[in-house]
């Protein structure tokens, strides 16, 4: 079988995300400097930066009406309106790469998790492009005042972050994709604990989900990295002057080599293959973030379990 990326109109029938409880505290916003106007201008000379909440990088797109109708359009509209107000009052958001978003069919968005902006910016951007992914998010978010109910109405898939739940989470995620719906995940599982807010160690569930859903569909499910940077320095009590926030929606991963021989895997994706795909995602996220920040990424990565920097 040739493991090429799934065509945009694919539909179908039929490691671990891990229980990651909070550990330590994220570093304060003073730990990083704001994203400067000069750096945004430098990025704009290389990439086509757009307002992801209002602009279409390649012209207006045909919305996926089936997804929209299935995901409470009235609640979605209200949430987007609220997010738009917050984003515009607190920041100046730009993005590149949204032309990569498929108009139809399943795909996976693996997003960074520096701040809550890493939730809202990709969400609003994909909604504006006419897609309605399901979101894997910690179950506690459903209990948040006011917006918790909205999260459930607009596609949140609650994640019970307890031991023994990983397989169920992965199976639910695979079923979402094999039904033809897109899925968004945050592989770090919680806000990064890296003192300088680089991507940290990730659970290999994103690798399991991508590989298993591709095996069941018989084609490589498109997998994209969404990297957001700039919100870490925002003071939410007094956000002015507004800070720059930039998101990159990267081109699709090619992980066909990891699908070789998948018919002989048995009931589970080999751990080494899920680990390798997850590692590639982390490395790529770090490369993109380094470009957005205009900085050299530190060697290695921050390990959540040991709360220290380790070698790759």
Model-predicted segments: where are they?
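Residues at the C-termini of beta-strands that transition into short coil/loop
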Residues: 99, 139, 160-162, 227, ...
């Amino acid at each position: 079988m040739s493991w090429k990326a799934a065509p945009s109109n694919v539909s179908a029938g039929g490691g671990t995300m891990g229980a990651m409880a909070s550990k330590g505290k994220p570093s304060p916003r003073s730990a990083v400097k704001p994203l400067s106007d000069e750096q945004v201008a430098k990025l704009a000379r290389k990439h086509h930066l757009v307002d992801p909440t209002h602009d279409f990088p390649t012209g207006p797109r045909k919305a996926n009406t089936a997804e929209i109708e299935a995901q409470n359009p009235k609640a979605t509209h209200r949430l987007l309106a609220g997010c738009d107000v917050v984003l515009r009052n607190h920041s100046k958001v730009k993005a590149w790469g949204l032309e990569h978003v498929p108009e139809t069919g399943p795909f996976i968005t693996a997003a960074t998790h520096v701040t809550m902006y890493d939730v809202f910016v990709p969400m609003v951007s994909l909604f504006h492009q006419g897609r309605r992914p399901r979101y894997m998010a910690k179950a506690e978010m459903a209990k948040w005042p006011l917006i918790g109910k909205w999260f459930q109405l607009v596609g949140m898939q609650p994640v019970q972050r307890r031991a023994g739940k990983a397989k169920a989470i992965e199976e639910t995620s695979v079923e979402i994709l094999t039904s033809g719906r897109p899925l968004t995940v945050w592989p770090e599982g919680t806000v990064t604990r890296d003192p300088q807010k680089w991507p940290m160690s990730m659970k290999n569930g994103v690798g399991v989900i991508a590989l298993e859903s591709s095996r069941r569909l018989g084609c490589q499910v498109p997998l994209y990295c969404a990297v957001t940077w700039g919100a870490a320095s925002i003071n939410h009590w007094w956000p002015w002057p507004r800070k720059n926030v930039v998101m990159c929606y990267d081109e699709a991963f090619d992980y066909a080599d990891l699908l070789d021989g998948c018919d002989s895997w048995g009931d589970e994706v080999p751990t080494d293959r899920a680990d390798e795909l997850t590692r590639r995602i982390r490395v790529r996220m770090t490369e993109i973030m380094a470009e957005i920040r205009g900085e050299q990424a530190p060697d290695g990565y921050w390990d959540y379990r040991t709360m220290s920097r380790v070698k790759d």
